[in-house]
């Protein structure tokens, strides 16, 4: 199933129509969501968070980040959407420039900073940094081929995603870290992590509950995977029998399929929405930010 075929499925068409009405003033079922943000470390104080619409969730974006700028050796910190966007714009410019110039060193630094910003860098011995170091000798070529695949009109919801390097078939890496790199590498590609997956799953559940008075199973086209939180007090599983959603695991192909479906949904929504998102510089990024905030706890 490619993008066109996916978006033309009846249940996807219905979900998009419902999704686009969420922030309309005349919506009989306005979207509201609230939770308490758990304190990091040993603290017990919880911070209440609530939104009265999808757009309001974007307006209330807050996420603490820090990373080291490998080009200036400065430590950069922030919490707001605008400061985070400034960092992402810088990463994206450096990433694209390095690929144009075929400079693996600059490309590696840009990717390293993206992962560091996202809190998913890992180390030289394990995790995303280890994988990045393995790819470093041919990183610009590798990412160029990944970009070509993900931006193709013919990319499908397949069982595996690979590229051929030195006559060897290499599986495309995908997890909560690499989705951040691909989001800045490719056009119309959102960051799909556990929180975004949880939010989309929750919205699908609400849609199905409102659409069908008689409960039904979640159609595969709208089955999004959520990610478990590290904190056991943070629930990101929106399942409510018979609406059952699955958790992301270590399968790159499953993560990519979910990311592609989310890309297509968010891109289509951003082009057709009559909400305040349309007035933003990058509607898809703003919608992603809203989903990220909603999906902290469901």
Question: What residue spans do the PLM features occupy?
Answer:
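Helix-hairpin-helix/helix-loop-helix acidic hairpins
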Residues: 84-170
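Catalytic cores of nucleic-acid editing and processing enzymes
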Residues: 133, 141-153, 167-172, 210-213, ...
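C-terminal accessory module of base-excision DNA glycosylases/AP lyases that mediates lesion recognition
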Residues: 1-65, 194-199, 203-298
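Helix-hairpin-helix
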Residues: 161-186
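Short, solvent-exposed positions on alpha-helices
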Residues: 105, 190-194
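Generic structural signal for hydrophobic core residues of well-folded globular domains
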Residues: 114-124, 181-188, 200-203, 269, ...
């Amino acid at each position: 199933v490619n993008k066109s075929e996916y978006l033309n499925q009846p249940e996807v068409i219905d979900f998009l129509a419902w999704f686009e009405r969420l922030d309309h003033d005349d919506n009989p079922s306005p979207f509201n969501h609230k939770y308490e943000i758990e304190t990091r470390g040993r603290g017990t104080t919880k911070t209440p968070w609530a939104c009265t619409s999808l757009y309001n969730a974007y307006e209330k974006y807050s996420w603490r980040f820090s990373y080291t700028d490998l080009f200036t050796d400065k430590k950069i910190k922030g919490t707001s959407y605008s400061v985070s966007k400034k960092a992402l714009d810088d990463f994206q410019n450096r990433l694209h420039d390095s690929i144009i110039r075929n400079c693996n060193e600059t490309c590696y630094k840009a990717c390293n900073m993206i992962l560091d910003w996202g809190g998913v860098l890992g180390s030289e011995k394990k995790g995303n940094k280890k994988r990045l170091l393995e790819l470093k000798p041919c990183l610009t070529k590798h990412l160029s081929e990944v970009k070509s695949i993900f931006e193709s009109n013919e990319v499908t919801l397949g069982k595996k995603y690979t590229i051929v390097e030195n006559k060897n078939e290499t599986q495309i890496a995908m997890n909560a870290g690499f989705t951040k790199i691909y989001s800045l590498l490719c056009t119309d590609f959102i960051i799909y992590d556990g929180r975004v997956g949880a939010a989309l799953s929750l919205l699908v559940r609400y849609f199905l509950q409102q659409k069908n008075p008689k409960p039904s199973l979640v159609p595969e086209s709208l089955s999004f995977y959520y990610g478990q939180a590290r904190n056991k007090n943070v629930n990101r599983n929106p399942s409510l029998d018979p609406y059952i959603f699955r958790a992301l695991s270590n399968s790159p192909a499953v993560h990519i399929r979910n990311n592609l479906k989310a890309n297509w949904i968010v891109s289509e929504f951003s082009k057709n929405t009559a909400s305040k998102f349309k007035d933003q510089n990058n509607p898809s990024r703003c919608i992603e930010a809203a989903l990220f905030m909603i999906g902290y706890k469901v």
